[in-house]
Amino acid sequence: MNQYDLNLILNPNLSAEQVQIEKDYIETALKNVGAEVSNLDDLGNRRLAYQVGKDREGYYLMYTIKAGGNPEKDIASSLRLRDHVRRVLVVKDRPEWKTKKA
């Protein structure tokens, strides 16, 4: 199983209940693809580098997941269908570079 970073930006105007609903949906979508969540960083509302739609802020969620195969397209396509999801980025973690010892 490979390790991936899943970064999401949600609508900044969501209530706490709506954010929890989105988190539950994301975790269900990840389980449907065969991925397991190993870490979740909830960064909350942050200012965006540029305007996305009409929003200058976004609600950031950063997941560390483990999945087999090549789940990037499956995960991203299922999450982009949500109305409150503004951006999705799935990146495969690379192992640490091995350096030669002198």
Curated annotation (Swiss-Prot):
A single cellular component GO annotation: cytoplasm
Keywords: Ribonucleoprotein, Ribosomal protein, RNA-binding, rRNA-binding
One GO term of the biological process aspect: translation
Keyword Ribosomal protein recorded: yes
Pfam families according to UniProt: Ribosomal_S6 (PF01250)
InterPro entries (UniProt xref): Ribosomal_bS6, Ribosomal_bS6_sf, Ribosomal_S6_plastid/chlpt, Transl_elong_EF1B/ribsomal_bS6
Keyword RNA-binding: yes
Disulphide bridges, residue numbers: none
An MF annotation (GO) of this entry: structural constituent of ribosome
Family as reported in the entry's similarity comment: Belongs to the bacterial ribosomal protein bS6 family.
Function, in words: Binds together with bS18 to 16S ribosomal RNA.
PANTHER family per UniProt: MITOCHONDRIAL 28S RIBOSOMAL PROTEIN S6 (PTHR21011), SMALL RIBOSOMAL SUBUNIT PROTEIN BS6M (PTHR21011:SF1)
Name by which UniProt lists this protein: Small ribosomal subunit protein bS6
Gene: rpsF
